[in-house]
Amino acid sequence: MIQMQTTLDVADNTGARSVMCIKVLGGSRRRYAGIGDIIKVSIKDAAPRGRVKKGDVYNAVVVRTAKGVRRPDGSLVRFDGNAAVLLNNKLEPIGTRIFGPVTRELRTERFMKIVSLAPEVL
């Protein structure tokens, strides 16, 4: 469950280390984002020679949440922290590698690239 001002780890190799959610996209009064939702983020901490700089604003897709996601069979998939993957304006991943597991809920046509780059799909 991600809302405005939530800080997330970055699960790709763009050079960003942590980001802050500045808007949950999809609806004028939408408050929360879950796994697979697109959010607007600001870079809060970045590596010196990365692709992105501190203060830049990007789209991102949420790939892991501490709240987790409920499956139709009743099981719950949860993670230790919140993580996102940075996207460009065409909603394609900026990085070329994904770190850590992602959930099966990302297997939509929009995010198949992220699923194929991920080392583990839960």
UniProtKB/Swiss-Prot annotation:
<keyword id="KW-0687">Ribonucleoprotein</keyword>
<dbReference type="GO" id="GO:0003735">
    <property type="term" value="F:structural constituent of ribosome"/>
</dbReference>
<keyword id="KW-0699">rRNA-binding</keyword>
<dbReference type="InterPro" id="IPR019972">
    <property type="entry name" value="Ribosomal_uL14_CS"/>
</dbReference>
<protein>
    <recommendedName>
        <fullName>Large ribosomal subunit protein uL14</fullName>
    </recommendedName>
</protein>
<keyword id="KW-0689">Ribosomal protein</keyword>
<keyword id="KW-0694">RNA-binding</keyword>
<comment type="similarity">
    <text>Belongs to the universal ribosomal protein uL14 family.</text>
</comment>
<dbReference type="GO" id="GO:0070180">
    <property type="term" value="F:large ribosomal subunit rRNA binding"/>
</dbReference>
<dbReference type="InterPro" id="IPR005745">
    <property type="entry name" value="Ribosomal_uL14_bac-type"/>
</dbReference>
<dbReference type="Pfam" id="PF00238">
    <property type="entry name" value="Ribosomal_L14"/>
</dbReference>
<dbReference type="InterPro" id="IPR036853">
    <property type="entry name" value="Ribosomal_uL14_sf"/>
</dbReference>
<comment type="subunit">
    <text>Part of the 50S ribosomal subunit. Forms a cluster with proteins L3 and L19. In the 70S ribosome, L14 and L19 interact and together make contacts with the 16S rRNA in bridges B5 and B8.</text>
</comment>
<dbReference type="GO" id="GO:0022625">
    <property type="term" value="C:cytosolic large ribosomal subunit"/>
</dbReference>
<comment type="function">
    <text>Binds to 23S rRNA. Forms part of two intersubunit bridges in the 70S ribosome.</text>
</comment>
<dbReference type="InterPro" id="IPR000218">
    <property type="entry name" value="Ribosomal_uL14"/>
</dbReference>
<dbReference type="GO" id="GO:0006412">
    <property type="term" value="P:translation"/>
</dbReference>
